[in-house]
Each structure stands twice: as structure tokens, then as C-alpha cells.
UniProtKB/Swiss-Prot annotation:
A 1,2-diacyl-sn-glycero-3-phospho-(1D-myo-inositol-3-phosphate) binds at residues 243, 269, 288. Residues 32-49 have a biased composition (Basic residues). Residues 187-321 form the PX domain. Residues 81-94 have a biased composition (Basic and acidic residues). The PX domain binds phosphatidylinositol 3-phosphate which is necessary for peripheral membrane localization to the perivacuolar punctate structures. Its main location: cytoplasm. This is Sorting nexin-4. GO terms for cellular component: cytosol; early endosome; endosome membrane; phagophore assembly site; phagophore assembly site membrane. Residues 1-143 are annotated as: Disordered. It is a peripheral membrane protein. It comes from Candida albicans (strain SC5314 / ATCC MYA-2876). Belongs to the sorting nexin family. It is found in: Cytoplasm, Cytosol; Preautophagosomal structure membrane; Endosome membrane.
Length: 630
């Protein structure tokens, strides 16, 4: 196929596509394109005759020419759309003339092609375009003409506003926020009792403690298996067993969620008993039991901690706590594999300690009178608790030794009764009665020793630890105030340096900026290299002046923002310590000391009452024996 035939077939295909799409065409454009076709045909004939390029080259060039013609035609149609109404008569005449004049050359006029339907008139095409352009305007007008929404009643508006305010408040609430409205409405009573030795999945022994809760708090009831109290009962009582590791998870979670709240300390796990292997002795287990029970009591009387979701999950009898602790174990094992040094060493704590050590002492002085008074009270209370602990530790040892002595004394009296067994039965009976009384006295002393050692002394030691923990909270506040004072001094220095630099430069330019270097030749000629070096230095210093001033202003702005942030944190922490944490701690401390002293008094009263009853019986028996002998 020659290049002319190829061009004709391409033109036919193009015209078929135009006819099927019913796109209006201008015959004047066709006449122009026909002229270009003739010239291109002649050029293609020349190229074929001279054999300059192969047929593939002519095919690609013809295809490119057709694409250019199509684009030219589209552009011309877009340009002539606006003039369709004016030139309708001329276009009809041009169509007839072009159809007659170009019937031999234009393949669209060939008799071989089917008769095409009449294309749309230019007026109709213009109307279609106008309708398409008017669609977005109509949509906009319809939106603007929509009727106003019906106003809801006043109560509905108020409810919607209250809901929106509540949502905003929930969004503004911090992560550790707890709703304390349930603290006054509902009651929670939890005790830790009955330690028991169990085996885990790896057959390793451990001690579990029975945590019994009685409550009507709905946030706790929904976590339990029962979901609600029994019919006719107001409170629901349920129990669950927890081991020491569960208490440790609770403590760490509360410490992370409430860093500015006084969290009671747990009994230390790094005890000497763990090295000796005596971790399952009755003495050690009961000491830990009383400490854990006191830990729970402190949480119960705290408005925030008692209403925390993690504590509710801890005391509930559902299986969600096991899932929670398992996920924590997996997270800890996957996140930290740097060994014991990486787990124990706290980089932030080391940095804070070093920085506070290097900080001048003038910033470490406390100025708040309330904080100073609280700190003094805590230190005095701590010293008194330590003194009581030392005194009762000595008394405990004395009681323990005295109990052993009475035990040995009763054994010796019992031996005397066995010696006198064959000689005098009356003396033997009297020795047995007296030996039993001494044995009872020894057991009573041992019970007194056990109570002082496992309960009373542990309460004093725990309260002393609570004092230290509260002192640490005050120390956190002091560290924040020290940081704030250091930041304020640093800001003052920056402002002074900035004002000094601007004052020195204001004499020449008034704006605090250095003037550009002047090419003044000094009397000393140091050579081209020295002069060029000095010029470069002056230029660099001048170019850096604006940047350095911008950096200084940004630094001052950042310092002011940080100071405002630290001031707010410090104010909130100070108010919380004075108005919330210390009154709560003082109330708990008074109750615990009172209960400990009352418990010690009750134990002593019981001890001496039992001795009076026992020795009264012994005295009556001995007097009766003497009367019989008389």
C-alpha cells in the first residue's frame, strides 16, 4: 500500500469517528486541511520517488501529521464556537462550496461512504455547553435557597450544648484523669487475708493472698462475673487470689498513671530472707500480708486511686487481669533486652541527680511556708517512728527471750514433778499445775512477741516508708522549682546579652545590627592576603548577624514558653500537695497510728487478763491443796 492510500484510509477512519460522535465540523477548516493534504501528498510522493526514507518512516510521519490536523481542528472549533450565531449563513454557503469544489479530493464526499446523520447545529451545541456551565451554578443556588433548618426546642438546645461541653471536657482531660464522683456515692471495702502456698504452671511454689471485696460500685460490678448483687442484697461480695507480682503490677501502673500522686510503697522484694531461702516461713508471709493489706487500705481511702480503672480491674474476679498482666510481660520482654544494667539504671534519674548536684545552692532553697511546714512535720514524724521502731524492737527481743526463759523454767518444774512422782503424789500434782501455768505464760509472751514483730513494728516501718515517699513527692516539687529558677536565670542572661548587643550597635545604625564593612584601607599594609582575609571575616560576621539575632529571639521565645509551662506544672503540683495529698496522708496516718496503738493496747490487755485468769485458777488449786494438807 502506497503512502497516499495509507493517508486516505487514515482520513476515512478519522471522518467515520467524527460522524459517529456527531461533532460539528467546519467546512472551511476542511478546505484548509485539504490543501495541506495535497501538499503532504506531493511531498510524500517526492519522498517515495527519491527513496529518501523507507515506508515505515512515511507511515509514522503521516500519523503525526494526522494527529496535528486533529488537534488544529479541535482548537479551531473551540475558537469558532462563540461566532456560530453570527456566521451561520456564511458557514452554510461555505459548506456547499467546499462540498462541490472538493468532491474529488475529499474522501468524505465519496459515494462509497454511507450517508451520515446530520450533526448538531452550532446553536444546539452552544446551548449544551451553556447547560453544562450552568449546572454548578444551579447547584450552588439550590444550596443557598434551601430552607433554614427547623430550630429545636430550648431544652434540646441546652442538652446538645451540655453534651458538646462534656465532650470538650473529656477531650481536655489528661490521661490520668479519674472521675471521683463515685467516691462519695458508693463504698468499697477490700481486705487481704489468708495467704496460701500454691504452684504455678512450672511447678514452682508461690504465695497467693485472698483479696475479698464488698462493694456496690457499678464500675466494679460490671467487671465481676456476677455483674450485680443478689436479689434483696445491696452489696456484692466476691473474692480473688493475687500474688505479690500482681500487687507489683498494680503499683507500677498507678505510679505511671499518677506521677504527682502519693503512691504507697510495697514491701521490698530485695529482702535478706530471699537469699536464705526462708521466703515461705510464717513470719515472713504474715509480715508481707499486713503490708499488702495496708497498701490496699491507703488506696481505698484515696479519692483518685480508689476510682482508677486499674485498681477496679485488680480487685475484680474476672479473667481480664490475667490477660492484662500477660500483655505487660510480653511488652516488657520485647521492649527491654539490654540486661540487668539497662533495666535497673534510670538515665533520667541519673541526669536529674547530676544536674541538681551541679545546680547552685541558692536555687534549692524552699520559699513556700506551707511546704516547709509539711516537710518539717514529715521529718519529725519519721524520726519519731524510727525511735518507736527501735524501742519496740528491743522490747520484742526481751519478750522473746523472756518467753524462752519461761518455757525452760516450766520444763524444769515438770522434771521436778517426775522426780517426786514416787515419793509424794500431792507435790507432783502441784508441780504439774505450776508447770502448766508457766507454759501458758511462755505461750502468751510468744504471742505478744509475734504480734509486735509481725504487725505493730511492720505498721511503724510502713508508715516511715510512707513518710519517705511523701518527702520524695516534695523533692519532686523542689526539683521542678529548681529547674524553673535555672531557666529564669538563663532567660535573664539571654535578655541581658541581647539588650547589651543591641545597645552597642544602636549608636551606629539604631537597629542593633552591624553595619556592612567599609573598604577602608588602613595605614598598615599587610598585603593582599591579609586584607582579603579580614574582608572575608567582616563579611561573614555581617551576614551572620541577622541569623544569630533570629536564633537568639527563637531561643528567648522557647525559654519563655518553657518557663510558662514549668510554672503551671509547679503551681498545680504545689496546690495538689498542700490541699489534697497532705491532708489525705495526714488523715490516713492518724488512723493507722491510732489503730496500731489500739491493737497493741488490746493485745497487752488480753495478755494480762489471760494471765490473771490463769494464775487465779492456779492459786485456787494450790490453796485448795494446802487446805487439804492442813
Amino acid at each position: 500500500m502506497s503512502s497516499e492510500d495509507q493517508f486516505t484510509s487514515i482520513q476515512w477512519d478519522r471522518d467515520d469517528g467524527e460522524n459517529t460522535n456527531n461533532t460539528p465540523t467546519d467546512t472551511t477548516i476542511k478546505s484548509k486541511s485539504s490543501k495541506s493534504k495535497k501538499s503532504k501528498k506531493s511531498s510524500s510522493k517526492k519522498k517515495n520517488g527519491n527513496k529518501i526514507s523507507p515506508s515505515s518512516t512515511t507511515e509514522t510521519s503521516d500519523a503525526d501529521d494526522t494527529m496535528k490536523e486533529v488537534t488544529d481542528q479541535l482548537e479551531s472549533t473551540q475558537i469558532n464556537d462563540d461566532n456560530h450565531e453570527v456566521d451561520d449563513g456564511n458557514k452554510e454557503q461555505n459548506v456547499d462550496a467546499n462540498q462541490i469544489g472538493n468532491s474529488d479530493e475529499d474522501p468524505t464526499n465519496s459515494l462509497l461512504l454511507p450517508v451520515n446523520p446530520q450533526p448538531k447545529e452550532p446553536q444546539e451545541e452552544k446551548e449544551d455547553l451553556q447547560q453544562q456551565l450552568q449546572q454548578p451554578q444551579q447547584q450552588l443556588a439550590s444550596i443557598q435557597q434551601e430552607p433554614a433548618p427547623i430550630q429545636p426546642p430550648f431544652n434540646a438546645v441546652v442538652n446538645d450544648e451540655s453534651l458538646s461541653i462534656q465532650q470538650q471536657q473529656q477531650q481536655q482531660q489528661p490521661t490520668g484523669y479519674v472521675d471521683i464522683s463515685y467516691y462519695e456515692k458508693y463504698s468499697i471495702k477490700t481486705t487481704v487475708t489468708h495467704p496460701n502456698r500454691d504452684l504455678d504452671t512450672a511447678s514452682k511454689p508461690f504465695i497467693s493472698y485472698l483479696v475479698t471485696t464488698t462493694t456496690d460500685n457499678p464500675s466494679i460490678l460490671k467487671l465481676t462475673k456476677e455483674k450485680k448483687p443478689k436479689q434483696g442484697e445491696e452489696y456484692l461480695t466476691f473474692s480473688v487470689r493475687r500474688r505479690y507480682g500482681d500487687f507489683r503490677y498494680l503499683y507500677e501502673s498507678l505510679s505511671n498513671d499518677f506521677p504527682t500522686v502519693m503512691i504507697p510503697p510495697l514491701p521490698s522484694k530485695s529482702n535478706f530472707k530471699y537469699l536464705t531461702g526462708d521466703t515461705f516461713s510464717s513470719e515472713f508471709v504474715h509480715k508481707r500480708l499486713h503490708s499488702l493489706d495496708r497498701f490496699i487500705r491507703f488506696i481505698l481511702q484515696h479519692k483518685i486511686l480508689s476510682q482508677s480503672s486499674i485498681f477496679h480491674l485488680f480487685i475484680s474476679n474476672s479473667n481480664d487481669w490475667a490477660t492484662f498482666t500477660t500483655s505487660l510481660k510480653l511488652k516488657d520482654s520485647s521492649s527491654d533486652e539490654s540486661g540487668i544494667v539497662g533495666r535497673v539504671v534510670n538515665e533520667d534519674l541519673i541526669t536529674e541527680t547530676v544536674m541538681n548536684f551541679l545546680t547552685p545552692s541558692k536555687h534549692k532553697k524552699e520559699t513556700n511556708k506551707d511546704i516547709l511546714e509539711i516537710n518539717d512535720k514529715l521529718k519529725k514524724l519519721y524520726e519519731n517512728l524510727i525511735k518507736l521502731d527501735k524501742i519496740f524492737t528491743k522490747l520484742k527481743k526481751k519478750n522473746h527471750e523472756l518467753g524462752n526463759d519461761y518455757d525452760q523454767f516450766s520444763n524444769q518444774i515438770l522434771k521436778l514433778s517426775s522426780v517426786q512422782k514416787g515419793e509424794d503424789s500431792i507435790m507432783t500434782t502441784n508441780f504439774k499445775i505450776f508447770s502448766d501455768s508457766l507454759n501458758y505464760f511462755s505461750k502468751s509472751y510468744n504471742e505478744m512477741y509475734r504480734y509486735i514483730d509481725e504487725n505493730f513494728l511492720i505498721s511503724l516501718q510502713d508508715l516511715a516508708k510512707f513518710c519517705l515517699r511523701f518527702i520524695q513527692l516534695i523533692k519532686l516539687k523542689n526539683d521542678k522549682s529548681t529547674d524553673l529558677a535555672v531557666l529564669q536565670d538563663f532567660l535573664n542572661k539571654e535578655l541581658a546579652n541581647n539588650s547589651g548587643g543591641s545597645g552597642s550597635g544602636s549608636g551606629s545604625g539604631g537597629s542593633g545590627l552591624h553595619q556592612p564593612p567599609n573598604p577602608v584601607i588602613s595605614s598598615y599594609q599587610g598585603g593582599i592576603v591579609n586584607n582579603t582575609t579580614q574582608l572575608i571575616k567582616d563579611t561573614l560576621s555581617t551576614s551572620n548577624t541577622t541569623i544569630s539575632n533570629t536564633i537568639k529571639s527563637d531561643k528567648i521565645k522557647n525559654l519563655e514558653q518553657e518557663i510558662a509551662k514549668e510554672t503551671k506544672i509547679l503551681t498545680d503540683l504545689t496546690n495538689k500537695i498542700i490541699n489534697e495529698e497532705y491532708p489525705n496522708w495526714e488523715k490516713f496516718n492518724k488512723i493507722e497510728i491510732k489503730n496500731s496503738m489500739l491493737g497493741l493496747c488490746d493485745q497487752n490487755i488480753k495478755f494480762y487478763n489471760d494471765l490473771l485468769e490463769k494464775f487465779g485458777e492456779v492459786e485456787m488449786k494450790l490453796i485448795k491443796r494446802l487446805d487439804e494438807d492442813m
